[in-house]
UniProtKB/Swiss-Prot annotation:
The keyword rRNA processing does not apply. Gene3D superfamilies: Immunoglobulins, Transglutaminase-like. This is Protein-glutamine gamma-glutamyltransferase 5. It is found in: Cytoplasm. Catalyzes the cross-linking of proteins and the conjugation of polyamines to proteins. Contributes to the formation of the cornified cell envelope of keratinocytes. Coiled coil: none annotated. Belongs to the transglutaminase superfamily. Transglutaminase family. Ca(2+) binds at N405, D407, E453, E458. Keywords: Acetylation, Acyltransferase, Calcium, Cytoplasm, Metal-binding, Transferase. GO terms for cellular component: cytoplasm. It holds the Pfam family Transglut_N.
Length: 724
């Protein structure tokens, strides 16, 4: 400065947060290009432009302030004060001088890898020579978890995994049954417009924030804490969470869960209605919406499906199922069930609250089943702890263990009494599935949750879990009847296969029963199958067999039986006989649930023995999907024509047909097309235009619903080029 010129306070004229450049470096450019969204543990640059002069290190002292939450507190780490010389305190932030020009200053700032995530206000205080002090608000930014930062507790080493579990905004959720695993496309849309704001709003609507906002904001640096808050907020059982659950088959005042194809419409509806819960969701919808929120916040997350999933309500690692003497499954008196499939999330994080070795993938289940510390949430439970039977480790590991490894006990109820029929040690936990990394294929990750069925290690882990449970609880009168501690049968010595028969021999009767399908059961067609009876003894056997069929919800809840039959079979020594069965479409069509699941059962008895034998099989009716064709190459900001081909698989007309389509980066909002009536076995197609607004790999998701079916789905992967 020239001699004689008065020294004035340094005044900021303009701040450039360099949002576009910073967001690219922080992998948040799809969230926004004009708002600063950065990740903790990684530097970002800003430029300060001054009014009157440049920054003079000997005469000017700059102090930065970063604040989050309604009551920023230095001690709690929600307020940070730091300068170019560093800072102290529980969560040190870093400021570095990058370039000092005539009237501007380029600065690099970095939040510590333990900083609380959320919305921040950045301020500056400048102390100049002779006591001049100026202070400014430089702007707002959003801070997220950083799986690219080795010091962050959500660090994930593999770049392909980071791309799949943080960046990818579409995927598949597996449904159906272990014999017919069906990939259902889903639009996570974590980078769609306003989704980041809705995710932060979700945190602020939590009970934790409402009770103690200061502490809640301070704890948001922990992915363990944050994931539990999000998990509780996805369902609405304790609060104004995102989704109402409904398994009643009555959805007249909302949306059938099977019709959803993405999270964006759900989250935006929740926000637009003043945070009123959206109607309705079931397990895969809860898990999909949670995946969207967690990926948006920066925690690596994937969606997991477990086929034949145990729901053990009383915590004894036994799933009790009850049948009457016709073979009909009864509404469970204890509410234990085996869900045909159940869907939850895995989130990747360190677990410093647990012994070494239990970090990595953690189970989080937002479906409201049981409470955890008074709230309807489940987890995070270490997948490693589940596999090792460490059911006493936080959080809710016992419940998660039972979902994949409980035993099943079958009971016959008659004359006010209960007779034990069978204890099955191999039913629960099959084909645990998730989408492959950067592929449309399915990954089977069952071995991450349990040792091979029938192995010594698997048996030892199960017994360890039982011993831990026995040490922490006492059994009630009814539980004593199904007490697994006194006599635990050995596990079947065979690996599971989707085609393995449900052969259940009785040691007393020396008779086995199993069902065999004669053809693949399709929606709208008759179901043909046989009951195979085998006499494994040297004596004659006179059998009476009561057969029944009833629809199931995917959570295992039975509906009204619609078919019954009685068979009398005489078996010569070591003879095998087949009893043919047929269920007409006209017999089951009016009784189907949305899930299109039918359970056939047979209860057998031999006239010279009081023992009973039970066999059952779950049938999933298949149906054709939707075909989507993209006509021509796709370019950003250029019209694209999409053709959708669909059909009515039934021999009767269906009404109220509605087609919905969506896809992040392809459609600004969900498209809804009224089709009306589809004639029997009629194939139809429509074309529509859209203008892609994001480049890269994208996906179109489609759903067709009618008065007779709700979830005929299809998808199409589309690569969108930037163009010229």
């Amino acid at each position: 400065m020239a001699q004689g010129c008065p020294i004035t306070g340094l005044e900021v004229a303009l701040t450039d947060l360099q949002s576009s450049q910073n967001n690219v470096r922080h992998h948040t450019e799809e969230i926004s290009v004009d708002r600063l969204v950065v990740r903790r543990g990684q530097a970002f640059s800003i430029t300060l432009y001054f009014k009157n002069r440049g920054f003079q290190p000997g005469m000017d002292s700059i102090m930065f302030v970063a604040e989050t939450g309604p009551l920023p507190d230095l001690a709690k780490g929600t307020r940070a004060v730091f300068s170019f010389t560093g800072s102290g305190g529980p969560s040190p932030w870093i400021a570095s001088l990058e370039a000092n020009r005539a009237n501007s200053l380029e600065v690099s700032l970095c939040a510590p890898p333990i900083a609380a995530v959320g919305r921040y206000l950045l301020k500056i205080r400048i102390d100049s020579y002779q006591g001049f002090v100026t202070a400014y608000q430089l702007g707002e930014f959003i801070l997220l978890f950083n799986p690219w930062c080795p010091a962050d507790s959500v660090y994930l080493e593999s770049e392909p995994q980071r791309q799949e579990y943080v960046v990818n905004d579409y995927g598949f959720i597996y449904q159906g049954s272990k014999s017919w695993i069906r990939p259902c496309p889903w639009n996570y849309g974590q980078f769609e417009e306003n989704i980041i704001d809705i995710c932060l709003e979700l945190l602020e609507k939590s009970l934790n924030f409402q009770v103690d906002p200061s502490t809640d904001c301070a704890l948001r640096g922990s992915p363990v804490y944050t994931s539990r808050v999000v998990c509780a907020m996805i369902n609405s059982n304790d609060d104004n969470g995102v989704l109402n659950g409904n398994w009643s088959e009555n959805y007249v005042d909302g949306i059938n869960p099977a019709e959803w194809t993405g999270s964006v419409a759900i989250l935006k509806q929740w926000h637009a209605t003043g945070c009123q819960p959206v109607r309705y969701g079931q397990c895969w919808v809860f898990a999909a919406v949670m995946c969207t929120v967690m990926r948006c916040l920066g925690i690596p997350t994937r969606v997991i499906t477990n086929f034949d999933s145990g729901h053990d309500t009383d915590g004894n690692l036994i799933i009790d199922e009850y049948y009457d003497n016709t073979g009909r499954i009864l509404e469970n008196m204890k509410k234990d069930t085996v869900w045909n499939f159940h869907v939850w999330n895995e989130c990747w994080m360190a677990r410093k609250d647990l012994p070494p070795g239990y970090g990595g993938w953690q189970v989080l289940d937002a479906t409201p089943q049981e409470t955890s510390n008074g709230l309807y949430c489940c987890g995070p439970a270490s997948v490693k702890a589940i596999k090792e039977g460490e059911i006493d480790l936080n959080y809710d590991t016992r419940f998660a263990f039972s979902m994949v490894n409980a035993d099943c006990m079958s009971w016959l109820v008659y004359g006010g009494k209960e007779q034990k029929l069978h204890q099955d040690t191999a039913t629960v936990g099959n084909f645990i599935s998730t989408k492959s990394i950067q592929s449309d294929e399915r990954d089977d990750i069952t071995e991450s949750y349990k040792y091979e069925e029938g192995s010594l290690q698997e048996r030892e882990v199960f017994l360890k879990a039982l011993q831990k449970l026995q040490a922490t609880r006492s059994q009630g009168p009814h539980q004593a009847n199904s007490n697994p501690f006194s006599s635990v049968p050995p596990r079947h010595n065979s690996a599971r296969s989707p085609d393995s028969p449900s052969l259940q021999p009785s040691d007393v009767l020396q008779v086995s029963l199993k069902f065999e399908l004669l053809d693949s059961p399709k929606m709208g067609q008759d179901i043909n199958f046989v009951l195979l009876a085998v006499n494994m003894s040297p004596q004659f056997k006179d059998l009476k067999l009561n057969l029944s069929a009833q629809s199931l919800l995917h959570d295992g809840s039975p509906l009204v039986p619609f078919w019954q039959d009685t068979a009398f079979i005489t078996l010569f020594p070591e003879e095998e006989k087949s009893y043919p069965c047929k269920i007409l479409y006209s017999q089951y069509s009016q009784y189907l649930s949305t899930d299109k699941l039918i359970r056939i059962s047979a209860l057998g008895e031999e006239k010279n023995s009081p023992e009973k034998i039970l066999v059952n099989k779950i049938i999933t009716l298949t149906f054709p999907g939707i075909m989507i064709n993209v006509l021509g190459a796709a370019f950003v900001n250029q019209p694209l024509t999409v053709q959708v081909v669909f059909s009515n698989p039934l021999s009767e007309p269906v009404e109220d047909c509605v087609l919905t389509l969506e896809g992040s980066g392809l459609f600004r909002k969900q498209q809804r097309v009224l089709i009306g009536v589809l004639k029997p076995h009629h194939k139809a197609s429509i074309t529509l235009k859209t203008v892609p607004f994001k480049s890269g790999q994208r996906q179109i998701q489609a759903n067709l619903r009618s008065n007779r079916f709700k979830d005929i789905k299809g998808y199409k992967n589309v690569y969108v080029d930037i163009g010229l």
